[in-house]
């Protein structure tokens, strides 16, 4: 039959394609949400309890989407002792657009110039917070295709989430995640198990090319998110049940079949409501619900229709209570980065994954299924799953990826808190200057984490020059390398063999390496 899969196709696929390594980056400063409540003159608990947020990371004008992605990529390469020529595909998922033509990926190619590796597929992928997941799927599809040349794929998801003054501002944040994709991975993409929903909606969008701020319909955005979750979960359940039936297992899939369930997290409270939403789906689909103790006390909701429940407080309250233990077991740990740093848009759901890996041992993770719900306004959404390898022995791939993230909490704790008025001043500075030419950023370089790339200047042709805050190991820098616009061939890129310390520098810093996006 035309278009059908050959019977022996699976034998040709690389084994256990998945996430081999993961690196996360967030800036060195945050604002406390409780202090922000006082500054904004809102009721105590509106941000901390109502949204579930404790702190919100932000960056000064010294960092932009290019520098965020450069930082997380170089950190991943260095910490995993990877050669730049082992990457065959590099794709960026972002909705932080600073150029309508030139991709972030092309800026990242500056990091590869010393290696001579230019044979790297992939560009940028954009649809609100979904771009990172689309890039991940493209990477997996490349490795499982005839185009694969045996090298790794590298996916970068990063964003700067900023909002105008008002109710949405405390749901901001900033960060980037880099994912190394390849075969024989500790976190394996379960083949054939993706439930996707695509729909036209104006829930959140950015039509103003001169502003970083979105237009948000808050109520519609929540409805779209939960509706997409309903549909994606339904499709996923049908697909995994079909797989199970082929294996002789005739049972329905439920939340209990996920070891962990992580979500795109605009704010933590929505994630808690989303897990409750999945339990509501299980409840309505269970023909024997009266025999399941988890549904005790929910009998009155047996005839509700999903589409009528998005803003039903009684349903929400009842199922949040019923799912509280499941939330603690399967989802709460995933909210570490979201609670402490805020919404990272495309990288948000992968920050949730990093949070889980950072807080559980390889033995606790081994063999578990991790459900992943990715959502981007407009809208695009997918629920898929990762299967954790069974091999949790010392030195295993699973041991290495968890070890690389074991300091995540200490890194979050090492950041510097700033007063809300300083945060507001930085937001106003971004608003006034993000589009300027002939601009030299005003933000402090000293406050950045070691190993952080930062913006040096924007010239009269909108060309951006970057430098990297050195680490104590950067002893190979040429004397006199200044902060000037220059060709990459004359500049130093720290060796991939060097390690990046996680905590901020305390000693006086040496001169910084400089990199630019070229004289074109």
Swiss-Prot record:
Keywords for the protein's UniProt record, in alphabetical order: Acetylation, Cholesterol biosynthesis, Cholesterol metabolism, Cytoplasm, Lipid biosynthesis, Lipid metabolism, Phosphoprotein, Steroid biosynthesis, Steroid metabolism, Sterol biosynthesis, Sterol metabolism, Transferase
Example GO BP: cholesterol biosynthetic process
Modification N6-acetyllysine occurs at: 46, 273
Name recorded for this polypeptide: Hydroxymethylglutaryl-CoA synthase, cytoplasmic
Catalysed reactions, as listed in the record: acetoacetyl-CoA + acetyl-CoA + H2O = (3S)-3-hydroxy-3-methylglutaryl-CoA + CoA + H(+)
Chief site of localization: cytoplasm
Record PTM Phosphoserine, positions in chain: 4, 495, 516
PROSITE patterns: HMG_COA_SYNTHASE
Coiled coil: none
GO function terms (MF aspect): hydroxymethylglutaryl-CoA synthase activity; protein homodimerization activity
Intracellular or extracellular location(s): Cytoplasm
Entry's EC annotation: 2.3.3.10
The protein's annotated pathway: Metabolic intermediate biosynthesis; (R)-mevalonate biosynthesis; (R)-mevalonate from acetyl-CoA: step 2/3
Residues annotated for (3S)-3-hydroxy-3-methylglutaryl-CoA binding in this entry: 44, 129, 167, 171, 221, 264, 273, 343, 377
Gene Ontology annotations for the cellular component aspect, listed alphabetically: cytoplasm
Residues given in the record as CoA binding sites: 44-46, 167, 221, 269, 273
SUPFAM superfamilies on file: Thiolase-like
Subunit structure and binding partners: Homodimer.
This protein's encoding gene: HMGCS1
Main EC class the enzyme belongs to: transferase
Chain's role: Catalyzes the condensation of acetyl-CoA with acetoacetyl-CoA to form HMG-CoA, which is converted by HMG-CoA reductase (HMGCR) into mevalonate, a precursor for cholesterol synthesis.
Region (Disordered): 492-520
PANTHER family linked to this entry: 3-HYDROXY-3-METHYLGLUTARYL COENZYME A SYNTHASE (PTHR43323), HYDROXYMETHYLGLUTARYL-COA SYNTHASE, CYTOPLASMIC (PTHR43323:SF4)
In-chain residues carrying the UniProt-annotated modification Phosphothreonine: 476
Active-site residues, as the UniProt record annotates them: 95, 129, 264
Source species: Pongo abelii
């Amino acid at each position: 039959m035309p278009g059908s899969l050959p019977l022996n196709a699976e034998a040709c696929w690389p084994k256990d394609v998945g996430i081999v390594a993961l690196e996360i980056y967030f800036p060195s400063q945050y604002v406390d949400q409780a202090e922000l409540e006082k500054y904004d003159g809102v009721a105590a608990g509106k941000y901390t309890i109502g949204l579930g947020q404790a702190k919100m990371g932000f960056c000064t004008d010294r960092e932009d989407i290019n520098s965020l992605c450069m930082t997380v990529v170089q950190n991943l390469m260095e910490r995993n002792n990877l050669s730049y020529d082992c990457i065959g595909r590099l794709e960026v998922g972002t909705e932080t657009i600073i150029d309508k033509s030139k991709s972030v990926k092309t800026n990242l190619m500056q990091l590869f110039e010393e290696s001579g590796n230019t044979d790297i597929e992939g560009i940028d992928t954009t649809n609100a917070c979904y771009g990172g997941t689309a890039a991940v799927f493209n990477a997996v599809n490349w490795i499982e295709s005839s185009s694969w040349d045996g090298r790794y794929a590298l996916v970068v998801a990063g964003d700067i989430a900023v909002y105008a003054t008002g109710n949405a501002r405390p749901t901001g944040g900033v960060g980037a995640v880099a994912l190394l994709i390849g075969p024989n991975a500790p976190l394996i993409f379960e083949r054939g198990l993706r439930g996707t929903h695509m729909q036209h909606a104006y829930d959140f969008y950015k039509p103003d090319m001169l502003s970083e701020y979105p237009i948000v319909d808050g109520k519609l955005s929540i409805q779209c998110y939960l509706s997409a979750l309903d549909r994606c979960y339904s499709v996923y359940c049908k697909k995994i049940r079909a797989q199970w039936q082929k294996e002789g297992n005739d049972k329905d899939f439920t939340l209990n079949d996920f070891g962990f369930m992580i979500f795109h997290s605009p704010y933590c409270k929505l994630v808690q409501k989303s897990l409750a939403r999945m339990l509501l789906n299980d409840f309505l689909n269970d023909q024997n619900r009266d025999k399941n103790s988890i549904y005790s006390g929910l009998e009155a909701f047996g005839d509700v229709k999903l589409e009528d429940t998005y803003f039903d407080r009684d349903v929400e309250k009842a199922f949040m209570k019923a799912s509280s233990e499941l939330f603690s077991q399967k989802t709460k740990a995933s909210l570490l980065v979201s609670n402490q740093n805020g919404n990272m848009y495309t990288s948000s759901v992968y920050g949730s994954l990093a949070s889980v890996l950072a807080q559980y041992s390889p033995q606790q993770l081994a063999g578990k299924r991790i459900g992943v719900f990715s959502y981007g306004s407009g809208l695009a959404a997918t629920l898929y799953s990762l299967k954790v390898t069974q091999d949790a022995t010392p030195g295993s791939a699973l041991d290495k990826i968890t070890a690389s993230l074991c300091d995540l909490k200490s890194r979050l704790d090492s950041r510097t808190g700033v007063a809300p008025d300083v945060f507001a001043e930085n937001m106003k500075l971004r608003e006034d200057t993000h589009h300027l030419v002939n601009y030299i950023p005003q933000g402090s370089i000293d406050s950045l984490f070691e190993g952080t790339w930062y913006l040096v200047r924007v010239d009269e042709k909108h060309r951006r020059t970057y430098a990297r805050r050195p680490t104590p190991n950067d002893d190979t820098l040429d004397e006199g390398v200044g902060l000037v616009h220059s060709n990459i061939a004359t500049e130093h890129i720290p060796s991939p063999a060097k390690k990046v310390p996680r905590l901020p520098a305390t000693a006086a810093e040496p001169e910084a390496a400089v990199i630019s996006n070229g004289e074109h």
